[in-house]
């Protein structure tokens, strides 16, 4: 309490606190309105173009900031009462007192929080801290465009930072110069099935800063904030920072809190490539180690005051930890040198047989065939390809009426049929069997006849399902295969036109929706419906020969894709996670684990990967290609580079008290039909702590419907974007760089060597005229060339 009073007196004396209004803390750039109950009513940042008001929950259970304690899995919230001084409040729960002071700190709105254990024994909660009260509840269009999604929260040993972002790309950063144990979010409940067991919902009710948290925590987190001894107190200052552009995040936070930060534009590299990253700090010491703890030589060059460039060659496949020490502060990052794309696809194909593909109500449970057929197309291996084809045919026959060529079960789940269409096309391209393409074509006709509305939308009864596992993209994939046969067979020409027109109508409906999309399950600003809408519009744009139409669709796609940034890990300095999208309700269905947790990357992160790839081809903006390759590097790490085994997803949350089913359903085998989402609590379960880690697959032992094979979307995405494609870019400063290739040359002559044998397509994005040699062939390309120069990649 003495500390708080001295701090308050100092701030008043310095003129940082206004004396006029009891409920408003402000300076020239912002106003912070505090209610009589100690909660935030609103936080307004003033800008030249207008004001940005940060929404907070009002008169709800999620009002904040609110002190809370979780013990034995149950939350208790404290109620603030005035503490006798302006802008200060206090509360107590079971002998633990918390005091909060709202004030100006380094020109930013800030809270200083002190927690005191007045009890007679140590205080060791599950967690204790603040529910911030920022409105994160995205439940309806168009309201969700103004809500803040917790995009990045990062605990370091000595400090904390992160940011929330809206779909309109307004960014609110959080920063503390003090170590914070952990963070968490509260998710809504979804539905009971069966009673009394709950599945989790699709919305976020609260972002929590957990100042004290039980162990274990990830190694990067503080390891000494798991208790308060009797009589002990700890204090934290937490500031809110208005970030105008995300590129300015690290610089702005360093300026406010004087913490060292690592800024990485690229997180994924090939072995032997030189990695670069910027370090923001005063006198940083930088160390890079491999996963065995061996140091790798780093060179550090000063670029400007407080900015340094680090360079390091990553010698072999693996993960590399970068550590920056600046004074008494320490930050960490992870770089990845990824395995070859060929090895990645070959291991994914092996996983298709190890982790059973099963005939269920959900296409996710047989998604592995995508990886297997793509690998079989480029790297045929009869010893496994024949077994894969046999397994696919077995499941297809279980799930379909072979005579009428339609699904036997759950026909309204049209994503099952569109996924099967895509797999049949890939199987046809791998094996050349016309019967597979014919099945795909007939299934597309059935889907269109039964589930396409007059306005073009593909639907499940009354809900638009076009962007539930990209139904239109699967039909366009079929169209492209049919078009190759159309010149010799009018039947295929007719089918290609029919299917293209259908998919185009569905995508046009998405464009006209202007972001008012629908999806499966509970409505929210949902990662998949946004990225799948963007990717399908982008794919259609690439198929347009008319430049006006191409631009029309490209502009629509880019608007949607930019809104998706708030759901994507675009700034996290971690190559395992970069480019992953923030899904959080899949664990209960995929690996039978509760409660919700952020899975990133998850299989559905691949949907954004297609979209950024298409965005690059449409615009030539290297930023989209960087995002694509960073994501592909993260995706490839779902295959453990040490042993080739497949993992399901990476969990981002630092600390989740989880429960997971640990026994198979003895009534079924992997060859049985099984329908619906099994409730994990109906089986033997095991309690476990999950935090910043990969989670294993379960389909090798779980016999009923489990959807962990959706991870294979990542390898399908790799197969369509980077497996066979290289890219050369001339940057504005004249530097020529390659992705998936090495570029050499002199003057206006370039020689390009692919990183892998199967890379046979080269896209060039050049400002000046060049003569380019690739794969033993040469071409002269004119000024401003931005297109495929050798080969022609699909979409």
Walk through the language-model features, giving the residues of each.
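Glycan-recognition and catalytic cores of secretory/periplasmic carbohydrate-active enzymes
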Residues: 304-315, 319-321, 329-769, 775-779, ...
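Beta-strand-rich extracellular modules
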Residues: 116-118, 323-328
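Short, solvent-exposed loop/linker segments at the N-terminal edge
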Residues: 266-273, 361-362
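Bacterial Sec-dependent N-terminal signal peptides
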Residues: 1-22
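Beta-strand-rich binding/interaction modules
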Residues: 273-299, 320-324, 759-780
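Beta-strand-rich recognition/accessory modules
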Residues: 24-27, 130-133, 137, 163, ...
